[in-house]
């Protein structure tokens, strides 16, 4: 009996506890990411943004949560009720599930699997199903058009993201996310004998792929200027037209969880994860998770500034950028990186 508990029960209980702790921390982080998104947008437009609920509006997201929870959900008469309610649940569940393999620090990961990057890529590819289900089940033209746009957009830019990941894997030689971070301990800064660890990270050696990944992440998460699936001026609110109350909140939660996931993935692949930017004792003393959160927050700030400054693309421009620019460019970079690694013997 003791062997049974030590082999199955306690490890399962510990994993459940870790998952709940990560879930609570992630939901709190998403609440303040949403607030930061609104504050940054307001600052660019010379407005104050949310500033009533709590000091500096810090509790605005929790007030919105209460508002959504206590509103009555209205289901359209012609909608498929089961799929209509299941769609936001699928969206938010998949967006949160991918965080199981994200290492926030050395050994701070729920499931340190050897194919972690493949798991994240697969989960992010499945998120489009929640949007398609919601658009189809609404039995309305605007949601259906938004869902079709989303499916085409996500499929188009997943190809480029896949090639970017292949390029990083060629340099690292592992699918494990922890190994990808640890591989960024050695690079240009180390070769030059400088303590500038940020020169070792992949953002410098793979700069074109860093730009492609960042822009493709915007398209993958339906962020402006690629928010065609929910374009307010064209499709009212896209696939979320018929949603309100808690289902709408779950779609929003899934969207921002996916955005935070892409910020974390950018941090891991290109910005050194939890590694400090300069290798000195004072910065090495700072916990790695602090560096991880700061870097992910910086990436999200870039997401928010793009939303504030860049106008929305037309649909044909979006498709042209994905298939005629990013796809051949990322494919060429894969070939170039593989050739350089083979030529120099770094592989």
UniProtKB/Swiss-Prot annotation:
Predominant location category: membrane
Reaction(s) catalysed by this chain's protein: a quinone + NADH + 5 H(+)(in) = a quinol + NAD(+) + 4 H(+)(out)
Molecular function GO terms recorded: NADH dehydrogenase activity; oxidoreductase activity, acting on NAD(P)H, quinone or similar compound as acceptor; quinone binding
One BP annotation, GO: aerobic respiration
Lineage top rank: taxon: Bacteria
Segments crossing the lipid bilayer: 14-34, 50-70, 83-103, 115-135, 161-181, 198-218, 258-278, 286-306, 321-341
Key word Coiled coil present: no
Compartments it resides in: Cell inner membrane
Keyword Ion transport: no
Record's keyword terms, sorted: Cell inner membrane, Cell membrane, Membrane, NAD, Quinone, Translocase, Transmembrane, Transmembrane helix, Ubiquinone
GO CC, any one term: plasma membrane
Alphabetical list of InterPro entries matching this protein: NADH_UbQ_OxRdtase_su1/FPO (IPR001694), NADH_UbQ_OxRdtase_su1_CS (IPR018086)
Record's bilayer topology term: Multi-pass membrane protein
Enzyme Commission numbers on file: 7.1.1.-
Enzyme class: translocase
Known role: NDH-1 shuttles electrons from NADH, via FMN and iron-sulfur (Fe-S) centers, to quinones in the respiratory chain. The immediate electron acceptor for the enzyme in this species is believed to be ubiquinone. Couples the redox reaction to proton translocation (for every two electrons transferred, four hydrogen ions are translocated across the cytoplasmic membrane), and thus conserves the redox energy in a proton gradient. This subunit may bind ubiquinone.
Family: Belongs to the complex I subunit 1 family.
Oligomer and partners: NDH-1 is composed of 14 different subunits. Subunits NuoA, H, J, K, L, M, N constitute the membrane sector of the complex.
PANTHER family: NADH DEHYDROGENASE SUBUNIT 1, NADH-UBIQUINONE OXIDOREDUCTASE CHAIN 1
Record NCBIfam families: PRK06076.1-2 (NF004741), PRK06076.1-6 (NF004745)
Protein name: NADH-quinone oxidoreductase subunit H 1
Organism: Rhizobium meliloti (strain 1021) (Ensifer meliloti)
Highest classification ranks of the organism: Bacteria, Pseudomonadati, Pseudomonadota, Alphaproteobacteria, Hyphomicrobiales
């Amino acid at each position: 009996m003791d062997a049974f508990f030590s082999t199955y029960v306690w490890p399962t209980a510990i994993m459940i506890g870790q998952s709940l702790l990560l879930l609570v921390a992630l939901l709190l982080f998403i609440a303040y990411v949403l607030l930061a998104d609104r504050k940054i947008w307001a600052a660019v437009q010379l407005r104050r943004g949310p500033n009533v609920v709590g000091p500096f509006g810090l509790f605005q997201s929790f007030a919105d949560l209460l508002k959504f929870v206590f509103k009555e959900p209205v289901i359209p008469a012609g909608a498929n009720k089961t799929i209509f309610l299941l769609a936001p649940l699928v969206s938010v569940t998949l967006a949160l599930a991918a965080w199981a393999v994200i290492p926030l620090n050395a050994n701070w990961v729920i499931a340190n699997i050897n194919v972690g990057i493949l798991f994240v890529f697969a989960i992010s590819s499945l998120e489009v199903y929640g949007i398609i289900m919601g658009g189809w089940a609404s039995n309305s033209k605007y949601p259906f058009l938004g869902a079709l746009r989303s499916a085409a957009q996500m499929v188009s830019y997943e190809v480029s993201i896949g090639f970017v990941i292949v390029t990083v894997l060629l340099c690292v030689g592992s699918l494990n996310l922890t190994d990808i971070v640890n591989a960024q301990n050695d690079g240009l800064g180390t070769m030059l004998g400088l303590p500038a660890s940020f020169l070792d990270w992949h953002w410098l050696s793979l700069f074109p792929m860093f730009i492609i990944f960042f822009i493709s992440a915007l398209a993958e998460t339906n962020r402006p200027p690629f928010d065609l699936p929910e374009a307010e001026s064209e499709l009212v609110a896209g696939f979320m037209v018929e949603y309100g109350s808690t289902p709408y909140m779950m779609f929003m939660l899934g969207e921002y969880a996916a955005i935070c996931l892409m910020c974390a993935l950018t941090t891991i692949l290109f910005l050194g994860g939890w590694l400090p930017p300069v290798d000195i004792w004072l910065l090495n003393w700072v916990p790695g998770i602090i560096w991880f959160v700061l870097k992910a927050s910086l990436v999200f700030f870039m997401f928010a500034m793009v939303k504030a400054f860049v106008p929305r693309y037309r649909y044909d421009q979006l498709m042209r950028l994905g298939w005629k620019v990013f796809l051949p460019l990322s494919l060429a970079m894969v070939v170039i990186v593989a050739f350089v690694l083979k030529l120099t013997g770094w592989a």
